[in-house]
Design a protein with these regions (language model features):
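C-terminal/domain-edge helix-coil "capping" segments
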Residues: 13-20, 43-50, 57-72, 82, ...
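Short, isolated positions within intrinsically disordered regulatory regions of eukaryotic proteins
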Residues: 7, 197-199, 274
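General structural signal for secondary-structure boundaries
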Residues: 27-28, 34, 130, 203, ...
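Charged, amphipathic alpha-helical stretches
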Residues: 6-49
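Short, Lys/Arg-enriched N-terminal segments with co-localized hydrophobic residues
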Residues: 1-4
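Surface-exposed short loop/turn segments
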Residues: 89-90, 129, 133, 137, ...
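Glycine- and small hydrophobic-rich membrane-insertion segments that are intrinsically disordered
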Residues: 106, 110, 122, 175-188, ...
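Long amphipathic alpha-helical scaffold segments
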Residues: 43-146
Length: 289
């Protein structure tokens, strides 16, 4: 039993560390490694659920063109989740990452109006349009492949705002994901959250970027427009910091790993490299016989 628990915990760590867009590959590898005990994979349900909720897995419902987020903030329990913008709920298979059983679901509660306002939806009858800036235009402008969601949380006392953008390019051996999570408290105007980037590059090697930045600020207006504006400021600042970090790595640490000159302390004349005689020209003199 001790060995089984140890093996299960190890396999769960594989699931937890699955790179963006590669959960199916990790599951296939786990099955290959546990052929002697195939029952272990069936015990990974909680690990799959934790992974999908933390990674903000996305899924498309039948007939829908917009991806929907799976998270603990949108959970209804028993494997069902809901989406505010499409007013629907669905069942989610965490192992296959497929949705089924879509049903109508209308959000109600103390923060329902603010939630709709952030999304830019009309909350009253008629043709009145929200005067608040919507989250949708911001996401579409800054993220080419993204999903977003706004959910009441903590007994309707706060609002959770989630943005997730995925970029998968397995043919070029890389995949990446951006995750934003904000918790807004209408009573204090506090906006707390985190920004996370996860990129995996695996051509002729295995390199992974995992970075996170906490966000803490106060919004005086407390409107949807004010919230989206502050989100935009925070994410632009983080993007600028990442760009500066990449430039610093390229011009600093990575450059320091390369020799400025060969061991001979002489630069190679690349236009004449075809005529070099190894050990003589590169060695700086006549080769010994």
């Amino acid at each position: 039993n001790i060995w089984i628990m140890s093996a299960l915990e190890t396999i769960e760590s594989f699931v937890e560390g699955a790179p963006p867009g590669e959960l199916a590959d990790v599951i296939a590898d786990i099955k290959a490694l546990t052929v002697a005990d195939p029952g272990l994979v069936s015990k990974l349900g909680p690990a799959f659920e934790k992974y999908n909720e933390e990674q903000f897995a996305t899924v498309r419902l039948p007939g829908s063109s917009q991806p929907i987020i799976v998270s603990s903030h949108s959970s209804l329990g028993n494997g069902r989740y809901y989406d505010v913008e499409s007013s629907s709920s669905f069942e989610y298979d965490h192992a296959t990452q497929k949705a089924s059983g879509a049903q109508s679901y209308v959000l109600e509660g103390a923060q329902a109006e603010l939630t709709h306002n952030i999304l830019g939806r009309v909350t009253n009858a008629g043709d009145r349009k929200s005067t608040l800036k919507t989250l949708s235009p911001y996401v579409k402008e800054h993220f080419p492949n993204a999903a977003y969601g706004v959910y009441p949380t903590e007994n309707d006392s706060k609002v959770a705002i989630i943005i997730v953008a995925n970029k998968y390019s397995p043919n070029n051996f890389w995949n990446g994901r951006w995750r934003s999570l904000y918790i807004f408290d209408p009573s204090s105007g506090a906006l707390e959250g985190s920004l996370k980037v996860d990129v995996h590059y695996y051509e002729d090697g295995n390199v992974r970027l995992l970075t996170s930045k906490p966000i803490s600020t106060t919004i005086s207006s407390g409107t949807g427009a004010g919230i989206v504006k502050e989100i935009g400021n925070a994410e632009k600042k983080y993007q600028d910091e990442l760009n500066k970090g990449f430039t610093s790595l390229s011009e600093g640490a990575f450059k320091a790993l390369r020799r400025q000159l060969p061991v001979t302390r002489q630069k190679i004349e690349w236009d004449k490299v075809a005529s070099y005689r190894v050990g003589q020209d590169i060695g700086g003199g006549s080769s010994r016989r």
